[in-house]
């Protein structure tokens, strides 16, 4: 089950209370204080793990709490620290304050560890309160309460290439033939109900991650169809590949315009992101000469439109996933784009 959003209360452990204790030894009827300190409460720690792909482990849980620190004991024995609670989450998980929507943590790298809530400090035992005017203090500190916070965990998939298109245009078929992903494929809309990641091996030394995002429909940015629930996953993709279907009644140019408008409404940054265009189901041109001519006119109209607008488009290619034509060229084109983006990012961090 793919779960990409959960609301949960997280709480670090309370500090253990300090002990009130006195030495009890033979021949020492009024021994001094020997109460140990309470242990600190356990911390809440987030750990990013790329072997985890969903937030399903948090589903149905209202609260997760780290262990409380143990109380202090006599003979100056300190209480044990409460065990930390480590929360394993996928790459791309954001921890958001459920009330203010402030992003508190952004976990994007394998092995990333972030202390989120510190456990409460253990109370001091009565040993600390002995002084000249009070040799037998009968007071010890209570432990300090741990922290608590209501948060929303949001998963935004991280991929090099995000597939953008209407439902049933061939995105799932494409990712199934170029990568190790095995999405459900059927001839009806919204076959893909959850995002899928696939590793695309271009050659022995180069690969990239592709994300199959559930189909977008007009009005998706306002919540129609699968709407906002999955548009957010496109935010973490470096490069967009628009998949356009020549078999749809809507012309290719109109498909592209509608898809781009939905991205623009959702995020201005997405609208300006670099992209390529793939015309899917190119084998369909075999259905007749007249249909082939119509598709050619469609593609020409789209090409002219792209030249008219100021856009970051890098290529336009025809592909048949069924006949496996154009796939090799597509993979190399995408790899070159990803390499360029990676190098640019690397230069920015130097």
UniProtKB/Swiss-Prot annotation:
One annotated Gene Ontology cellular component of this protein: cytoplasm
Gene Ontology biological-process annotations: ribosome biogenesis
InterPro entries: G_OBG (IPR031167), GTP-bd (IPR006073), GTP-bd_Obg/CgtA (IPR014100), GTP1-OBG_CS (IPR006074), GTP1_OBG_dom (IPR006169), GTP1_OBG_dom_sf (IPR036726), OBG_GTPase (IPR045086), P-loop_NTPase (IPR027417)
Residues annotated to bind GTP: 165-172, 190-194, 212-215, 280-283, 320-322
Assigned EC number: 3.6.5.-
GO molecular function per UniProt: GTP binding; GTPase activity; magnesium ion binding
Binding site residues for Mg(2+): 172, 192
Subunit-level organization: Monomer.
Protein name (record): GTPase Obg
Species name: Campylobacter jejuni subsp. jejuni serotype O:2 (strain ATCC 700819 / NCTC 11168)
């Amino acid at each position: 089950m793919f779960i990409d959003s959960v609301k949960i209360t997280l709480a670090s452990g309370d500090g253990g209370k300090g002990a009130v204790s006195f030495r009890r030894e033979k021949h020492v009827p009024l021994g001094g204080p020997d109460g140990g300190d309470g242990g600190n409460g356990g911390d809440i720690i987030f750990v990013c793990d790329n072997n985890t792909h969903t937030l399903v482990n948090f589903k149905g849980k209202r609260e997760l709490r780290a262990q409380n620190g143990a109380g202090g004991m006599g003979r100056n024995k300190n209480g044990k620290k409460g065990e930390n609670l480590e929360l394993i989450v996928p790459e791309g998980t954001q921890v958001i304050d459920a009330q203010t929507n402030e992003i508190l943590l952004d976990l994007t790298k394998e092995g990333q560890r972030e202390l989120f809530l510190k456990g409460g400090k253990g109370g001091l035992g009565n040993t600390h309160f002995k002084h000249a005017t009070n040799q037998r203090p009968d007071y010890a500190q209570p432990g300090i309460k741990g922290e608590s916070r209501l948060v929303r965990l949001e998963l935004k998939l991280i991929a090099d290439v995000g597939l953008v298109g209407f439902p049933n245009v061939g995105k799932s078929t494409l990712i199934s033939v170029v990568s190790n992903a095995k999405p459900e494929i059927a001839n009806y809309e919204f076959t893909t109900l959850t995002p899928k990641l696939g590793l695309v091996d271009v050659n022995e030394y180069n690969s990239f991650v592709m994300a199959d995002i559930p189909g977008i429909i007009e009005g998706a940015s306002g919540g129609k169809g699968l709407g906002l629930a999955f548009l957010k996953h496109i935010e973490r993709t470096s490069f967009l590949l628009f998949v356009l279907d020549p078999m749809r009644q809507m012309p290719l140019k109109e498909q592209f315009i509608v898809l781009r408008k939905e991205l623009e409404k959702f995020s201005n940054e997405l609208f300006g992101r670099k992209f390529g265009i793939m015309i899917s189901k190119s084998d369909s041109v075999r259905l007749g000469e007249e249909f082939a001519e119509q598709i050619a006119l469609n593609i020409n109209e789209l090409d002219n439109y792209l030249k008219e607008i100021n856009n970051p488009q890098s290529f336009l290619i025809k592909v048949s996933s069924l006949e496996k034509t154009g796939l090799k060229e597509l993979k190399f084109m995408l790899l070159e784009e990803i390499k360029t983006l990676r190098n640019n990012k690397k230069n920015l961090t130097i």
